[in-house]
Amino acid sequence: MNTSRSQAIFSAAQRLMPGGVSSPVRAFRSVGGQPIVFDRVKGAYAWDVDGNRFIDYIGSWGPAICGHAHPEVIAALQDALEKGTSFGAPCELENQLAEMVIDAVPSVEMVRFVNSGTEACMSVLRLMRAFTGRDKLIKFEGCYHGHADMFLVKAGSGVATLGLPDSPGVPRSTTSNTLTAPYNDLEAVKELFAENPDAISGVILEPVVGNAGFITPEPGFLEGLRELTREHGALLVFDEVMSGFRISYGGAQARFGVTPDLTTMGKVIGGGLPVGAYGGRAEIMEMVAPAGPMYQAGTLSGNPLAMTAGIKTLELLKQEGTYERLESTTERLINGILEAAKAAEVPITGNSIGAMFGFFLCEGPVRNFEDAKATDAERFGKLHRAMLERGIYLAPSAFEAGFTSLAHSEADIETTLKAFRESFAAVA
């Protein structure tokens, strides 16, 4: 496969941007080799600047659930562009998307739009403290909630890929109020509440982990967190930036029947444009300025283009049979991956929910981030390169979930599984 133009562009990029990228995982540091530079995307496919085509299982890290550049989304954006790219003022599109989110997500009675998942999580943390009058929070090892200082403690894929426990430049005083527990460990959470009476503002987690690889909640875990937070007067926050509208139309909370107090969202709700949101019970959300005293603002928040793409994407997802189709596609993919690895005698464990999937190159089960670290990252790097040579674009990290879309066809899945069979045989 010729990648000479990608190599030249990335070489130039390293003189212009730190590491040559705008987000660390894109640099391929954990899988080796140089990154592929994309030229365009359409449906389930991405083309690089050298003309190579790939079946894409990243989907812009989650937003492209309907497929890249869906014609109805593009048409809606073209119409919206004629009216301007940014208003900096209220627009009716915000109302429309807000109503759709409130209708879909069980916990959300009011919503505030922002520009990224990080911004949503930063804002919801401030809101947790404002509402409860408490400073501490509990997060889980391997759960990623953006790159805000207080969340960069045992934060999963980003820092794991770099081999860093957290990040230089984060003051110890900032993280001293961040308490961590292993995912799927209710007893550890009980101990933290016992050790910090009336001090914990809330518990935040990815209800389905996608940034420590793909890890699912054990039966009773989410329910147990709901009971504990109520018992201690703390808030339960689901970070559904990744799982929202991806594992079901109402996200993980609808799928598992556990309703948090607050929810953060992003990715899918922007239809591929920069967006984030946080929402929850009205009595909590009314703390947010200008309705209440907790300040949060943004120049591009509620951007009309992002709202337009989000509205059209959710309209497409709401069509009958959408999630059954996504689930079927993803199950066929992950089952085929597991079979291919086992045929090559490569240790593997994996799973899928909705349009998310993941696997670890180790014996299972994987219940938490500590278990995930047993994955054979070196072998995964070899597998990633082998798949890339066969035209399959996987996340360039052993600690990231994968994503399917409505655009992935049966032929795409079969082509992908053929590549996995060959690649597992090559790295066995």
From Swiss-Prot:
GO CC annotation: cytoplasm
EC number in record: 5.4.3.8
HAMAP family: HemL_aminotrans_3
Main localization (coarse): cytoplasm
Catalytic reaction annotation: (S)-4-amino-5-oxopentanoate = 5-aminolevulinate
CDD domains noted in UniProt: OAT_like (cd00610)
Gene: hemL
Subunit structure: Homodimer.
Protein name: Glutamate-1-semialdehyde 2,1-aminomutase
Pathway note: Porphyrin-containing compound metabolism; protoporphyrin-IX biosynthesis; 5-aminolevulinate from L-glutamyl-tRNA(Glu): step 2/2; Porphyrin-containing compound metabolism; chlorophyll biosynthesis
Subcellular location: Cytoplasm
PANTHER family named among the record's database cross-references: GLUTAMATE-1-SEMIALDEHYDE 2,1-AMINOMUTASE, GLUTAMATE-1-SEMIALDEHYDE 2,1-AMINOMUTASE 1, CHLOROPLASTIC-RELATED
Gene3D superfamilies: Aspartate Aminotransferase, domain 1, Type I PLP-dependent aspartate aminotransferase-like (Major domain)
Residues bearing PTM N6-(pyridoxal phosphate)lysine: K267
Any one biological process term the GO annotation gives: protoporphyrinogen IX biosynthetic process
Cofactor(s), names only, from the UniProt record: pyridoxal 5'-phosphate
Family statement drawn from the similarity comment of this UniProt entry: Belongs to the class-III pyridoxal-phosphate-dependent aminotransferase family. HemL subfamily.
InterPro entries, A to Z: 4pyrrol_synth_GluAld_NH2Trfase, Aminotrans_3, Aminotrans_3_PPA_site, PyrdxlP-dep_Trfase, PyrdxlP-dep_Trfase_major, PyrdxlP-dep_Trfase_small
MF-aspect GO terms: glutamate-1-semialdehyde 2,1-aminomutase activity; pyridoxal phosphate binding; transaminase activity
The keyword Glycoprotein is assigned to this record: no
Annotated keywords: Chlorophyll biosynthesis, Cytoplasm, Isomerase, Porphyrin biosynthesis, Pyridoxal phosphate
